[in-house]
Amino acid sequence: MNNTKKLSTNVIVFGALMTALVVILQLMGAFIKFGMFSVSLVLIPIVIGAAVCGSGIGAWLGLVFGAVVLLSGDAGAFLAVNVPGTIITVLLKGVACGFFAGAVYRLVEKYNRYAAVIAAAIVCPLVNTGIFLLGCRLFFMDTVAAWAAAEDFGDNAVRYMFFVLAGGNFLFELCLNIVISPIIFRLLNIRKKQG
């Protein structure tokens, strides 16, 4: 019983630390922009939290990420068009990227912890960007088409979505996560040795 209580306390404390880190990094990331949007530096603590504490904490950290995006004004261009669509897209992409990072980590960890870290680090930005693009398609396609036409993409709004709205951010986030993966792996090894 005492081990369960200790584990729960450790998970809560670690989750709280990762939550604070998500808030700080998302606010700092607002100063680094590719196109219209700031980069998501928070995907790293989301992956760490999901790997250490599981999909539930990963989903929580993603929810916090989404809430900070909405409250910081980073989603302002979309909020001006469709408030419910923006809230659904932003919160869902955050929760899902954290949840799936944790799920993939747990699935692959059985075979190789290093591969699990890399897989989670890849899945996190992939899910985040994928749901963002799906949200653009479902809720904002007319607006995206107008933006595409204004940027000389003609009637090719999908190409605009991939190359302007998501492209630079996705590549930055994916590369950063992959480069940081060995550090995440070392942190997890230290955590396993202590626990």
Segment roles from a protein language model:
Residues 25-39, 64-104:
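Interfacial aromatic-anchored transmembrane helix boundaries in multi-pass membrane proteins
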Residues 107-130, 195:
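Internal alpha-helical transmembrane segments of multi-pass membrane proteins
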Residues 91, 95, 99, 103, ...:
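Mid-bilayer segments of alpha-helical transmembrane spans in multi-pass integral membrane proteins
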Residues 1-19, 107, 138, 152-195:
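Alpha-helical transmembrane segments and their cytosolic interface
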